[in-house]
Every structure is written in structure tokens, then in C-alpha cells.
Amino acid sequence: ALLKEKKLPFGISCCYTSQNFASISSDEYFDQMVEWGASFVWYFHYMPIGNDAVPALLPTPEQREFMYHKIREARQNKPIFAMDFQNDGEFVGGCIAGGRRYFHINANGDCDPCVFIHYSNANIRDMNLLDVLRSPIFMAYHDGQAFNDNHLRPCPMLENPDKLREMVGKTGARSTDLQS
């Protein structure tokens, strides 16, 4: 309410699963976000990572296609900009991770190519940002883009795991998984 009151732009991040994809893409849900004052909504689909991952929550191809169309429909009909981390790959040329447009820094300062991919050779506490982006795993990401000619299947973990294994092996990146 405070951001809306002060007229500051803000967005909402949503994770859709095989169980909630219809409800969080409904007209009512979009209307609620607009009422709250959100300028944009950023959708991610569930990624089965971590010790307690539930692969059954990963959206099916049909559910991803449903979201593909619902988000484009919302862009045409709702006063909020909707983006989909996976399904908008065709607009951004595939995966945006690895420092191409985005990367993740965990609580220990490890710089991972993506919030979902916990491998690194760089820590922000030990090097500057430019050196992080020049680290072996980030350069492997740079050199490997696009990971798939089909930009709707851009992820080196989910849809192209052979590419991820190759990059980790080639660069000697270590696991930065804070759970295991």
C-alpha cells in the first residue's frame, strides 16, 4: 500500500506450479495485482531443486503452453506488464542468466549463473563484479549461449542438462548449494 500511495513503481514475482498455474494467471489474480498498484508481474515456473524438491510440481508442457498464452493475453488486456522467465525466451534470445542479463549472489557471496543453478568459481567478497563476470563458469555461459535453438527451451539445467554438466566440468565450478 505504501508504494502505491507514494506512486513508486513495483512488481510482483510469482512461481507457478502444476497445481496453481490456473489460479495465478486468472483474470481475478491479474485484477488483484493491478488493484494493489503493481506495474509488472514476473512469472517463474517451479524448478525442482534442493533437498525437498517435488518434481510433480513442475508444470507440464501443456501447462507451460497455457501460461504462454495467458501472459500474452494479459499483456493485451490488463494494465500490468507480465513477463515469464521461461516462456519469454524468444524475446530475449534464450537464457538470460550467466551475467548475460542476470545472475545470482547467494548469502555467502557466491556468484551463481542463476538462482536455480548453484555452481560458481567466484565470490563477490573476493573479487569485483567485472572479475565475477570474467570467471570461468560465467565465460562458459557466455560462450555457450544460446543453449538451444528453441528459445522456449532455454534452460541449461532443465531442458539442456548436458550443457550444464559440460560447463561445470570444463570450468571446475564448485557446488554452492547451501542446503546439502
What are these regions (language model features)?
Residues 96-100:
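Short, small/polar residue-rich loop motifs at catalytic or cofactor-binding pockets
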